[in-house]
Amino acid sequence: MKICAINGSPRKRGNTARLLSWALDGVKNAREDAETELINLYDLSFTGCRSCFSCKRVNGPSYGRCAVKDDLAPVLGKLADADGVILGSPVYFMGLSGMMRCFLERWLYPYLVYDAARSSIAPKRMATAMFYTMNVTEEQAGEAGLPALLRPMENFVERIFTRPYVLWCYDTLQFRDYSDYVAPVFDEAHKQQHREECFPMDLKEAFEVGHHMALGELREFDEHAREHHHHDHDHEHEHHHDHDHEHAHGHDHH
């Protein structure tokens, strides 16, 4: 079994990279013989789709695979026979990082068929997951419509492979020392507290994603998580006004 994690963040020790590392630890926890690899996109020199259409040419030598020869080519070769792929990206300007977007164009497009059946010619319908890290809170992300903006790419991943498990990591600690940067909108004390209280749970969830992916149980885990999140969301909504009242004079989260 081979499972790869794709880091779409420029930082190798940041929030996104840590989540991916924990996910791969979960893979190893489930199956010691599993082969895992963390690939940092920002170490590679590549572009998005070049629109050469070699992957679509009838009887062409590169039909169904990207013909561009650059640093991403061997990565795409590795992924072709992987059993699972975990994608991680920070949210930049309400979307994926540029490198992650470029990667997805190159990875997905060769397998997409222009037919009425919306066919996929991917070698495997492998398990997939997408991890998002962001500065905003869950409430702010919802108000801004972020889930709807990211969902189209999730749908393409599902069309080509399988429905991805989606992990949302909100309100991240962006700087080690906020006094070194001009960012007065953020409350560092709140950010630190949120990291101490919530980030360990995000890491645990990432670990569980890798664990269940390795066992072939990711879909069941995803369905259970969705049901649990829906229940928690309804419960939080019941006490929303009390929560707002308690924090009316507290930290500014915006």
Predicted regions and their residues:
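Short, glycine-/small-residue-rich phosphate/pyrophosphate-handling segment
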Residues: M99, Y111-L167
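The feature marks non-catalytic terminal segments
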Residues: I160, D180-E188
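Cofactor-binding loop segments of dinucleotide-utilizing enzymes, especially the Rossmann-like FAD-
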Residues: G8, L41, F131-T133, C169
